[in-house]
Swiss-Prot record:
InterPro entries: Adenylosuccin_syn_GTP-bd, Adenylosuccin_syn_Lys_AS, Adenylosuccinate_synth_dom1, Adenylosuccinate_synth_dom2, Adenylosuccinate_synth_dom3, Adenylosuccinate_synthetase, P-loop_NTPase
Lineage of origin: Eukaryota, Fungi, Dikarya, Ascomycota, Saccharomycotina
Cellular component terms per the entry's GO annotation: cytoplasm
Catalytic activity: IMP + L-aspartate + GTP = N(6)-(1,2-dicarboxyethyl)-AMP + GDP + phosphate + 2 H(+)
Binding site for IMP: D12, E13, G14, K15, N37, A38, G39, H40, T130, R144, N226, T241, R305
Main subcellular localisation: cytoplasm
Highest taxon, organism lineage: Eukaryota
Chain sites annotated for binding Mg(2+): D12, G39
Textual note on the cofactor: Binds 1 Mg(2+) ion per subunit.
Organism in which the protein naturally occurs: Debaryomyces hansenii (strain ATCC 36239 / CBS 767 / BCRC 21394 / JCM 1990 / NBRC 0083 / IGC 2968)
HAMAP family membership: Adenylosucc_synth
Protein name: Adenylosuccinate synthetase
């Protein structure tokens, strides 16, 4: 059976840390969607490991790791990430497997991404993408013109010629759309001819890989990227990513049925952050927001951009819970709230005087909602050295209880600092 870790807000919740903790006891860790457009840091002892595309389970020497079919892969970045891990003493190539059905991100996808974003910026409609080529790659995938891993590594005699034909066709369509954007196609093809050999040893039929593990009763952990509010269908469209970031993306990205899923863990930052453009009802453009940003060190791992900050939004989390069906929650970065005398939580939206029953899909409507807050007393003490959930300040426990009661989902873990040891486990019995 598979347990799943998913982001419940707009990303950057701290999913990697929970995955790292859980991976001590699993046999397989799998990424199901996304690309290197998101990132997180795992701290083991005194060493920090930055992950973008690779599964976090690589830090566990006994864990096999799969990059699934729903992931889009920029091969140079994949090997760069591997090399950076190796420089820090983490040698894990023999435990990394890549789906033959995953689509490839090329440099021209990244170039296209930036050109498209520049066009939107001129009309003040920028999405705020990372420029990693993720959207253009999913676009070519949806239009059935994309290039998959098996096209690159196939041993069939005509496969390399077919790869080059597909590649030139994609590049030519970009030239027609954007003109000559100073792109060296032959240099990139030469680069991929070398990557072809490097990649071959990692490529597997991911359907067989996953279902063999399930049949052998292996413990499997699925690591979702991004978060529900960035989902292509259920997020704040169009200010979203280009993949299915919720529970549905687990099945489609790995080729497993819903009945193979056991637990679904929702990761929730104790407040709310967002990178890039898009609606953010509980955003605090004031001293509270600045304090959250400073104490929380809210800067993106992938882009270095400042994250927008605000109070916890339970309307968002209720919506996220309905879609993903969390069996329990991991509240992260609770310690960031240590200095606040009072803490606010968004509990409902009203629009033109009427209370809304769900998170609105219309962004014009969303921009006009009034957020109703409840104010809870802060605990105003350092919780970073606490090792037992029961030793948390009473006001901290009341804050967590309010979240549990509102969502009707138990909290199983509470993060109180950046290291893997700064994770309190709550007894659910």
């Amino acid at each position: 059976m598979c347990d799943v870790v998913l982001g419940s807000q707009w990303g950057d919740e701290g999913k990697g840390k929970l995955v790292d903790v859980l991976c001590d006891e699993v046999d397989v860790c799998a990424r199901c969607q996304g690309g290197n457009n998101a990132g997180h840091t795992i701290v083991v002892g005194d060493t920090k490991y930055d992950f973008h595309m690779l599964p976090s389970g690589l830090v566990n020497p006994k864990c096999l790791n799969l990059v699934g079919s729903g992931v889009v892969i920029h091969v140079p970045s994949l090997f760069e990430e591997l090399e950076n891990l190796e420089k820090k003493g983490l040698h894990c190539r023999d435990r990394l497997f890549i789906s033959s059905r995953a689509h490839l991100v090329f440099d021209f996808h990244q170039r296209t991404d930036k050109l498209k974003e520049a066009e939107l910026s001129e009309n003040k409609k920028s999405i705020g993408t990372t420029g990693k080529g993720i959207g253009p790659t999913y676009s070519t995938k949806a239009s059935r013109s994309g290039i998959r891993v098996h096209h690159l590594v196939s041993e069939e005699p005509e496969s390399w010629e077919e790869f080059k034909t597909r590649y030139h066709r994609l590049v030519d369509s970009r030239f027609k759309r954007y003109g000559n954007f100073e792109y060296d196609t032959e240099a990139e093809l030469a680069k991929y001819e070398k990557y072809r050999e490097l990649l071959k040893g990692h490529v597997v039929d991911s359907i067989d890989f996953m279902h063999s593990a399930i049949a052998q009763n292996k413990k499997i952990l699925v690591e979702g990227a991004n978060a529900l509010m960035l989902d292509i269908d259920f997020g704040t469209y169009p200010y979203v990513t280009s993949s299915a970031t919720g529970i549905g993306g687990v099945c489609t990205g790995l080729g497993i049925p819903p009945k193979a899923i056991n637990k679904v863990y929702g990761v929730v930052k104790a407040y709310t952050t967002r990178v890039g453009e898009g609606p953010f009802p509980t955003e605090q453009l004031n001293e509270a927001g600045k304090t959250l940003q400073d104490i929380g060190a809210e800067f993106g791992v992938t882009t270095g951009r400042k994250r927008r900050c605000g109070w916890l939004d339970l309307v968002v989390l209720k919506y996220s819970t309905l879609i993903n069906g969390y069996t329990s929650l991991n509240i992260t970065k609770l310690d960031v709230l240590d200095t606040f005398k009072e803490i606010q939580i968004g509990v409902s939206y009203t629009y033109k005087g009427e209370k809304l029953n769900s998170f609105p899909e219309d962004l014009h409507k969303l921009a006009k909602v009034d957020v109703e807050y409840v104010t809870l007393p802060g605990w105003e003490e350092d919780i970073t050295k606490i090792k037992n959930y029961n030793d948390l300040p009473e006001n901290a426990k009341k804050y967590l209880k309010y979240i549990e009661d509102y969502l009707n989902v138990p909290i199983q873990w509470v993060g109180t600092g950046p290291s893997r040891d700064s994770m309190l486990v709550k007894d659910l019995n």
